[in-house]
Amino acid sequence: EFGTRADEEVRRMYEAWKSKHGRGGTSNDDCDMAPAMMSRRRRTAGCAGGVPRHLRYIDAHTRGDAGLHTFRLGLTPFADLTLEEYRGRFLGFRARGRAAARYGSGYSVRGGDLPDAIDWRQLGAVTEVKDQQQCGGCWAFSAVAAIEGVNAIATGNLVSLSEQEIIDCDAQDSGCDGGQMENAFRFVIGNGGIDTEADYPFIGTDGTCDASKEKNEKVATIDGLVEVASNNETALQEAVAIQPVSVAIDASGRAFQHYSSGIFNGPCGTSLDHGVTAVGYGSETAKDYWIVKNSWRPSWGEAGYIRMRRNVPRPTGKCGIAMDASYPVKDTYHPGTGTATARAAAMDVIKMVLA
């Protein structure tokens, strides 16, 4: 019968999942600690005799593929969480009205000037994948990744910067209870810079703002921010061709929770609840995709990244990726206010990419 697995197979898969994702305890206790992973049958048949609820969903996706899906699901770090627990612990973006940015709608390179593909990881503008743990600070991780990117492009120096400083010190947002990337950019601008990850490390929860570090260590600075035109994937592509960009998505679905690899084209809405960073784009077998950096550690997705379908019929983009995008500005990389000089500077970067 579809959806059933032998007790020993379930046990082996569960033990492998525990080992990969750092879970501990005895087998029986672990079964009780992972109710979401097991069906109600475990109450009478025991953990090894139960059918993993998430595994049944994953199996259904795999067997029903038949060429319909371009992505795979697996037992991710969230396989022991119900959908409600997953949403509550890891999705912390809070959508708000968009205020005017210093550089308005920004500058861009148009049409045929855009490279067919770009990957800022390969160009030295993306730090390692981080882990927000059970803190809803995705918005801070998204903003910091974008700042790390533009700072690396402008200075030639890739430095891991501090999410914890923003979580602790940005009074406009709510730390691990949620926030918005644009507010994080504004905090860094007003603060005169941001500290390094090494000096102000992430602790996985809200902390007290360390004023000594906040005022004395301003390793990276930004001078403004740009809000990308909403509901326009071409505008987002133009922005990502210049630098890593903070984006918000709807990550509330089971398919996203269990994403393992491939180009994500699964079901999702546009109720934006998660901040991530678009660090590139490309195409595979005539399917366009965004390269998106997440903050759920390297064991989720494709080494911590997800490729999301690009150029979909809806103007919002897949999972709303084109609805609320923004990026930080450094005057040394973005001279002027969207003039021909700024576009020329952007073209220099693109020429380097295409060389």
Q: What are these model-derived regions, one by one?
A:
Residues 1-355:
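Catalytic-core signature of thiol
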